[in-house]
């Protein structure tokens, strides 16, 4: 299934790169927008839909999981010099043979909501930053798809954009504060360093890690991902198409192993909450 998904994503990435292109959009404008999409704090309203396929999961290393993250990003203009960036992740999970004797599960996972208060302009040294809370919401539709815990903690991101490069890191920590007392407590640190290079033709190559440390079990989960994205226009609608591959450097005994695959479609929408 992973190969099929990757082939479909790659075919779309290359065959649709000029589909519906708006002649009024200059090459420079497209490249600038493509690079802006590498900035988690960009003043852009977007809806990324990201598919991640992982394998060799569970006690017998026979399980597989397709996780589709719906990730709306909404910037709110609080004042002349400040934005509040809302980043939500709603996972739709399809998994099989991960838990012995439980078969397959399909449904929603737990939702996370991050709010970043961020100055609109970079610092004198060229840094962009944002900080705020992250909330974990127990929205899972199956007990095997979520932790049945409410969580909260701090979140922050810092980055710089120099020429075609975007370099930075995003981090958060979540503690469980309420929920099912029979389920394990949550104390988890997430660290995401990232680097991206955007070419003048609106192609972007990115490398990142999405590392997670579970303080309750004292275990790391460390995948490293590389992806290639292309910004295209369907009429006047900008859409970024991305295909990528990753590898698990470290994971718990029952966690995913080996290669992972990713495909993402990111829709760039007019900002309805800009206050303009």
Name each model feature, range by range.
Residues 2-15:
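Bacterial N-terminal signal peptides
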Residues 15, 19-21:
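Boundary at the C-terminal end of the N-terminal hydrophobic targeting segment
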Residues 21-276:
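Transmembrane beta-barrel domains of Gram-negative outer membranes and organellar outer membranes
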